[in-house]
């Protein structure tokens, strides 16, 4: 169970780093929000899911 928690936290950190870089790039691109909003929504949905997963796994470990 601990390894699953550690992998979930690592995935959350990686996803956060990717979103930190990609969201400003999406808004600065010529297509802007209209062309890339599906990518932003997918990344945000993944991030929210990982936050809940880390919270659930943390409650099971503690």
From Swiss-Prot:
Q: Which gene encodes it?
A: psbZ
What biological-process GO terms show up in the record?
photosynthesis; photosystem II stabilization
Q: How does it sit in the membrane?
A: Multi-pass membrane protein
From the Swiss-Prot or TrEMBL record, give the protein name.
Answer: Photosystem II reaction center protein Z
Subunit and partners: PSII is composed of 1 copy each of membrane proteins PsbA, PsbB, PsbC, PsbD, PsbE, PsbF, PsbH, PsbI, PsbJ, PsbK, PsbL, PsbM, PsbT, PsbY, PsbZ, Psb30/Ycf12, at least 3 peripheral proteins of the oxygen-evolving complex and a large number of cofactors. It forms dimeric complexes.
Q: Which GO terms describe its cellular component?
A: chloroplast thylakoid membrane; photosystem II reaction center
Q: Which HAMAP family does UniProt cross-reference here?
A: PSII_PsbZ
Any matching Pfam family: Ycf9
Which family is it part of? Answer: Belongs to the PsbZ family.
Where does this protein reside within or beyond the cell? Answer: Plastid, Chloroplast thylakoid membrane
């Amino acid at each position: 169970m601990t390894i699953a928690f550690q992998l979930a936290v690592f995935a959350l950190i990686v996803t956060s780093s990717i979103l930190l870089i990609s969201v400003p790039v999406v808004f600065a691109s010529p297509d802007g929000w209209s062309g890339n909003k599906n990518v932003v929504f997918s990344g945000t949905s993944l991030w929210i899911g990982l936050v809940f997963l880390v919270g659930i796994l943390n409650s099971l470990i503690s």
